[in-house]
From Swiss-Prot:
This is Exportin-7. The lineage of its organism: Eukaryota, Metazoa, Chordata, Craniata, Vertebrata. The keyword Hydrolase does not apply. It comes from Homo sapiens (Human). The modification Phosphoserine is found at residue 570. It is found in: Cytoplasm; Nucleus. The modification N-acetylalanine is found at residue 2. Pfam families: IBN_N. SUPFAM superfamilies: ARM repeat (SSF48371). Belongs to the exportin family. Residues 30-96 form the Importin N-terminal domain. Strong expression in testis, thyroid and bone marrow, low expression in lung, liver and small intestine, no expression in thymus, and remaining tissues studied have moderate expression. Expressed in red blood cells; overexpressed in red blood cells (cytoplasm) of patients with hereditary non-spherocytic hemolytic anemia of unknown etiology. One of its GO terms (biological process) is protein export from nucleus. One of its GO terms (cellular component) is cytoplasm.
Amino acid sequence: MADHVQSLAQLENLCKQLYETTDTTTRLQAEKALVEFTNSPDCLSKCQLLLERGSSSYSQLLAATCLTKLVSRTNNPLPLEQRIDIRNYVLNYLATRPKLATFVTQALIQLYARITKLGWFDCQKDDYVFRNAITDVTRFLQDSVEYCIIGVTILSQLTNEINQADTTHPLTKHRKIASSFRDSSLFDIFTLSCNLLKQASGKNLNLNDESQHGLLMQLLKLTHNCLNFDFIGTSTDESSDDLCTVQIPTSWRSAFLDSSTLQLFFDLYHSIPPSFSPLVLSCLVQIASVRRSLFNNAERAKFLSHLVDGVKRILENPQSLSDPNNYHEFCRLLARLKSNYQLGELVKVENYPEVIRLIANFTVTSLQHWEFAPNSVHYLLSLWQRLAASVPYVKATEPHMLETYTPEVTKAYITSRLESVHIILRDGLEDPLEDTGLVQQQLDQLSTIGRCEYEKTCALLVQLFDQSAQSYQELLQSASASPMDIAVQEGRLTWLVYIIGAVIGGRVSFASTDEQDAMDGELVCRVLQLMNLTDSRLAQAGNEKLELAMLSFFEQFRKIYIGDQVQKSSKLYRRLSEVLGLNDETMVLSVFIGKIITNLKYWGRCEPITSKTLQLLNDLSIGYSSVRKLVKLSAVQFMLNNHTSEHFSFLGINNQSNLTDMRCRTTFYTALGRLLMVDLGEDEDQYEQFMLPLTAAFEAVAQMFSTNSFNEQEAKRTLVGLVRDLRGIAFAFNAKTSFMMLFEWIYPSYMPILQRAIELWYHDPACTTPVLKLMAELVHNRSQRLQFDVSSPNGILLFRETSKMITMYGNRILTLGEVPKDQVYALKLKGISICFSMLKAALSGSYVNFGVFRLYGDDALDNALQTFIKLLLSIPHSDLLDYPKLSQSYYSLLEVLTQDHMNFIASLEPHVIMYILSSISEGLTALDTMVCTGCCSCLDHIVTYLFKQLSRSTKKRTTPLNQESDRFLHIMQQHPEMIQQMLSTVLNIIIFEDCRNQWSMSRPLLGLILLNEKYFSDLRNSIVNSQPPEKQQAMHLCFENLMEGIERNLLTKNRDRFTQNLSAFRREVNDSMKNSTYGVNSNDMMS
């Protein structure tokens, strides 16, 4: 007993050190000791002692979090009886201790929610023992306010817990639990929550009473969690679902047809303090977003009418909207009015004219107060963008009145941005123009709004632009002009150039008229005249933000008015001809190139301008007709003949800048490569002339490497710049003739230099990444450009170099030792990922016969594959799926290996094979469809190989199985659980998930079934028996039909028949299970 007391005291002391000490070393030691405690065998009993006898809240918190970890573990899970005991203990503990610290109560409720979720399908005497949440909390709800808060919080946390997938359990299991919870409990919880809210709002709540205050807050959180539930498993990315539909089940219809539900929340909004209102509005946002198909047309019109009335009432009494959180949620609510309902439906609402006037006034006022809640403006602009986009399609006879109000919104946005410039400069405030992402998002929305009543938009822009441009010109000519006044006009012109680019980019070909094109011409003329003025001053001064706005304008102009699809008779070109003498597209392209060269000359050290300028050049070089016109321009010929640091400073070796600043060079040379290819043909002299600067750079690096002591920084910069340039050229050269010139130039002369760089600087990703990426590009047989002559050994020689580089990098990178978690991708995994991509490109390029390597005793292939295995085994399973680029490169390489090199896979050690199979098993449930599809393909190849070898081994053949195949079969027979697990997973996904790649899933399934017929039979029986008695026969028939006409082979005809059967099977199973709330009581199916 004394030992228990002593160890409790130690644990309490450690908790105090962990949560209270300011000394980092002490805290880390305490953390380490507590981790050991969590993993100790007597953790469970000590946690109970801590809860019973612990004197501090921190020790209670530790006990609750440790117990949560224990019940969550997937290996060695706690027995069912023990988990039931913990659940009951937690409920009793909460019921007898209402005055616990809030964080302790929260941790215990989290423990209850986790046990309930993970035990959702656990049965004891035919009773689902963890499905009694509402019964469990009834005793809390019938007690005092303090207990009622605990009960509501339990339901809220449970709903939230079941809605969230976690990485330690398969997604299929999560969705099955969520679906069952949705069907059996969620509506009851939502109804209970609404009833409690009605009771609370019916009483005169004393919100000075902190407990009643807390109860209302928890009820609103619970209601929001119910409405925010992922009903059909589609909201995997919460950052992008802001305009999504809430997929309310049909069984909830009654709650939404009853107008009192909607009215409850509008009444609450007006009757409770502003601090609660954001949650009320969040609930209204979700209610406004219920799927359209929940109602028929008449019901939807009635629901929309109530919704619009509620919005109108808020707009007529806007006092609470001065709170930023309320304002933000209300803007979201307004955006849902158009994302979920059609303009034709809105205009039929009785109060529409008054409501659209109020919304327009609210929007104009909001835009004028640009400094208040800027992130909320997105939702208002989204509403008006959707309204404006609907105008051409609206069929209703009722007036939409948008021709009156959209110009007001456009004017408010434009004038408010211009007026903000002076205040921002005067008060030193944060400039919205610094956040180019936010500005671009708003401009995309304005582009649609501004095209509605475009004449008014253009007239306003011309008037404001002329005023600012004239003032700017006068200030530049005045000797006494203050820098502040010049900065203000430059800021105003920056906004105007951005906005002009946006409205031109908003042009829609089928809805545009000659008059609107002529108006575009007026705007373009003004921007180009301003560009001439600012370019003429670049030698003295320049404005970075204005230059970025110009580039944004050029990009929009290019998309709309330059290219193969543009009608050359456009009135825009007529206006450009009259004002600026630009008669056709070629002359306009000349202006583009002139601007690009000017920017590269004067802004070569400004990364944002350089990268956007080069992106513009790159985009121009893609178009079939524009690239041919560009090549004829003298400025483009100048670039092709003078691409050196003397003319383009960003190509220089600036010792002050970072090595990663050279990324833009790849873009530059991709564009130059495309331009060069237009007229290159087979002209080797022209090619060699073009490559002279790169040849000189290679020779310089070779010279440095040949001496024992050289300037390492200079060598690195020269090499990194060079390989980035070459990757751009290699990417552009996608024809055989041009690519062969590049290959013969680089091999064998310069390949040793790349190998030497990897050998020297393997630990520095700033050097290795560009070199590895270049090699990956060189071995990529894009557009069949790597077609060597039949007498050429170059394909094999290229693969030897690939193997050499992978082996050298791989062996050296593994010597790095332990890498900190936050640096592991940059220092190690990124390079490994590129090596995987490189090997995949080489193996699938169809320019090497890999059979000859072993035949002639060449170990290049074997070295590359063995290095791949070494690198793979150095990566934890979790990292393979945590880093998307690594996932995609690994699984696509594995797909090639299982397809063409299965003998190599079969020859691996058992632990390696199990590692690879585990990675495939985990990848089957990945959220990335590409990864999941790749895993299906890998599994199909492995299963097919196994089936063929098994078939051969049972036949009397004169030639025995080779040693690798025999060993592989033996390993698979020793570990059948891995293949069986994958059979469970695939079948589970097909039956219970929103399976987006059903065809891919079907291909390995037949082989899995044929290899595991007894297991499949047991699995089938388990699924059938888990259904309600009246549905079991139908489910049994579904499985019978699945195997109807299927033979015991994997021939294409048989596979195709199975795939067809599977489509019908999935449909029939879904129909059969639609009204079923029963789950699958099978550990195999759920794991």
